[in-house]
């Protein structure tokens, strides 16, 4: 076993946000682009934050469900997630997003809300590049 080929981290407690959206498959690429330009970058560089508040944000597509987009955030801390969750800030971003992405979308699931924000990453195994 080559231990230099991977990293393993345990003992974490990183809050996880999962959002599942449904839309016309023809607009998925546009959604991903506008989501990145509005939500990802503006939440990452929100005024008043000392650093990017999330460790990662991934966008997943399921070939068996065209038009379904799953977004997964790994937040650094719940406090940083809460800061970005400021209602006025979120409403501002939603207005900007809606002005750039006029297509209908449906929030299908938000498992982190169903679990009362109880989903956390506790270990991570990653292959080194």
Model feature map: region roles:
Residues 1-69, 74-91, 95, 103-129:
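Short S/T/G/P-rich N-terminal loop/turn motif that feeds into the first structured element of a domain
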């Amino acid at each position: 076993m080559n231990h230099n080929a991977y990293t393993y981290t345990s003992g974490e407690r990183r809050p996880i946000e999962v959002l599942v959206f449904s839309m016309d498959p023809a607009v998925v690429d546009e959604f991903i682009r506008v989501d990145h330009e509005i939500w990802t970058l503006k939440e990452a560089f929100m005024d008043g934050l000392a650093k990017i508040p999330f460790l990662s944000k991934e966008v997943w597509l399921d070939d068996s469900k065209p038009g379904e987009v799953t977004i997964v955030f790994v937040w650094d801390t719940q406090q940083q997630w809460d800061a970005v969750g400021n209602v006025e800030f979120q409403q501002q971003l939603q207005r900007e997003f809606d002005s750039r992405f006029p297509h209908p979308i449906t929030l299908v699931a938000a498992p982190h809300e169903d679990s009362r924000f109880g989903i956390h990453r506790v270990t991570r195994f990653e292959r080194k590049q």
